[in-house]
Amino acid sequence: MLKDIRKPFQYPKLPIDKKEGAKKRAKAKDTKGTLRRIWSYLAERKGLLILVMLMVVISAIFGLLGPFVIGKAIDHFIVGKTVSGLIPVLLLLLAIYIIQSLSLWFQNYWMITISQGTVFRMRSELFTHLHELPIPFFDKQRHGELMSRVTNDIENVSSTLNTSVIQILSSVITFVGTIAVMLYMSPLLTLITLTIIPVMAASLKWITNRTGKLFKEQQKNLGDLNGYIEESVSGAKVIKAYSREKQITAEFLEKNAALKTSGFWAQTISGFIPKVMNSLNNLSFTMIAAIGGLFALKGWISIGSIVVFAEYSRQFTRPLNDLANQFNTMLSAIAGAERVFDVLDEKEEREDEKNAVHQPIQTGSIEFRDVSFGYDKGQQTLKHLQFTVPAGQSIAFVGPTGAGKTTVTNLLARFYEPNDGKILIDGTDIKTLTRASLRKNMGFVLQDSFLFQGTIRENIRYGRLDASDQEVEAAAKTANAHSFIERLPKGYDTVLTQNGSGISQGQKQLISIARAVLADPVLLILDEATSNIDTVTEVNIQEALARLMEGRTSVIIAHRLNTIQRADQIVVLKNGEMIEKGSHDELIRQKGFYSDLYESQFEK
C-alpha cells in the first residue's frame, strides 16, 4: 500500500463541485433512481455509446438480412431446382456475416471500454468519498462489509455493463426489426405470433416482482458474510486463544446459510424466466409451422417464406428471452449499485467553517472550556470538562474504561465535534481552523499501531513523505527502533505484511514513534502507547517517548500509572466528569481515587 507513496498521485477526474454532483445524481432509493444514476455515469461517454449503438444497429440489420436472403435462395434454388447464380448469393451471405461479426467485435470492444471506464470512476469516487467520511461512520460500519461494496458490488455492476447493455440494445432493435420484416412478409402470421406477448409480459412481471427483493437481500447477506470473514481472519489469534473455533464456525455457517437461502430463491425464481420463454418460443414455432404449412398448401405463401418466417419467429422470441435473462443480472447489479450509492450518499465530514483559516499551531497550548459530548443522543460521555495545558507541558488522563479518556483526544483532533463548550489551541477556537492545518501539526502514537503493507522505511516516512533516507534513520534512532531494524535481514527495506505481522507489538510501537518523530509535531497525542508491552520494550518506548515529548505539548492516556508519573498534570475522569486534577505527588497526598488506583497497581 505504501509502495511509491512519494510519487504524486494523479486523481481521476471526479466531480469537484459537490453540489453539482448532487444535482447530477439523485439519491438511489429505488430501481428507477438507481438506473438514472448509473446512466449519469454512462452519459459521460456519449461518443462511444453512440458508436456502440451504431454497431448494434448494423449487427441487428445484417442479422435480419441473412435469413431473408436464405429464404429467397430456397425459393429460387431448391423450389426452382436450379443452381444458376448460386455463387453470388453465397458471397453475399459471406459478406453479410463478416460485417455482422465485425460489428459485434467493435461493439463489444467499445462497450468494455465504456464499462471499465465507468466502473473505474465509480470505484475511484467511492474510495475517495470513503476517506472524506467522518470517523463516526467507520465506527458504526463493519470493515469487511464496506470492502464488499468497494469490490463485489462494483464488480457486479461492471460485469452487467459489459454484457447487459449491449444485449438489451441488440434485443430491442432485433425485436423491432423482426416484427417489421414479419409484417412485410405476412401480417396474418405476424398477428398470430404476437399473441404470445401478453403471456410473456404477465409471466415476466410476476417473476421480477418477487426476485427484486431477493437479489437485494442476497447482496446484503453477501456483505454481511464478507464482513464476518474479515473480522474472523483479523481476530484469528483471539479466536484460537479462547478456543472459539466451533462457535465462530457455527456463526459463519448461519450467515452462509442465510446467503445460500436468499441466493437459492433469487436464482430459482428468476430461473423460471428462460424456461417460460423457451416454452412460449416452442409454442410460437409450432403455430407458425402448422398454420404456415396450411397457407403454403393453398399457395398463399412460398416454402422459402415459411422457413424464413419460422426463423424470424425464433428471432422474435429470442430477444424477449434474452431480455428476460438479463433481468437476473440487472436486478443483482441494481441491488449492488444501490449499496454503493448508499455509501456515496453518506454525508462527508462536516466542512470547515466558511471563515476557517489554514493556520499552523504555534506553541500548542490547550484549553477545554466547559466541554460536553455524547456519542449517542441523551447519553453524555464527557460532562462540562475544563482544563488548561500550557505550551510545552504534558497532561495525562486516567480513569476506568468508558470514563471518556479517548474521547478527549477524538475531540481535540476534531474526529468528533463537542455538543457544548469550546476547545482552544494557542488561544484560538479549533472550529475556526481548518481540520487539515490542525491535524498536520499533531502527532499520534496509539495503542494499536497500524502499519501499512510496505517496507519499514516507507512506514516511517508516512510521517513526512518528503523525508530523506538519512532523516528516516535519524527518526528511528531517536525512537530506539534503529537497532532492531538493523538486525532484520533487509533492515529498513524489510517488507511488512498487512498491519505489520511478523514483528512484535513493541517493535510496531517503536516504528509508530519513529513516524511521529519524523512528522515533528507541535502537539503530541499518546493513547495507551505503552500498554500490552513487555518490560524491556517498555523501557525503550519510555525513553523514546521522553525524547519525543521534549518541548512539545503532550496529551497522554494510560491505564498503567507508572507511565505518567512525570506528567505536569494528571486528570482523573470517572463517568465523563473530572473528579481530581493535579501532579502525581499532589494526587497521592489527596488520598483520593487516583491514590487508591496507584496503590492497587503498585501492590500488584
UniProtKB/Swiss-Prot annotation:
Annotated CDD domains: ABC_6TM_Tm288_like, ABCC_Glucan_exporter_like
Compartments where located: Cell membrane
Binding residues annotated for ATP, in chain numbering: G399, P400, T401, G402, A403, G404, K405, T406
Domain ABC transmembrane type-1: 49-332
Keywords annotated in UniProt: ATP-binding, Cell membrane, Membrane, Nucleotide-binding, Transmembrane, Transmembrane helix, Transport
TM helices/strands, residue ranges: 50-70, 86-106, 172-192, 288-308, 510-530
One of the protein's GO biological processes: transmembrane transport
Stored InterPro entries: AAA+_ATPase (IPR003593), ABC1_TM_dom (IPR011527), ABC1_TM_sf (IPR036640), ABC_transporter-like_ATP-bd (IPR003439), ABC_transporter-like_CS (IPR017871), P-loop_NTPase (IPR027417), Type_1_exporter (IPR039421)
Protein family according to the UniProt entry: Belongs to the ABC transporter superfamily.
Name the record gives this protein: Uncharacterized ABC transporter ATP-binding protein YfiC
Lineage, uppermost ranks: Bacteria, Bacillati, Bacillota, Bacilli, Bacillales
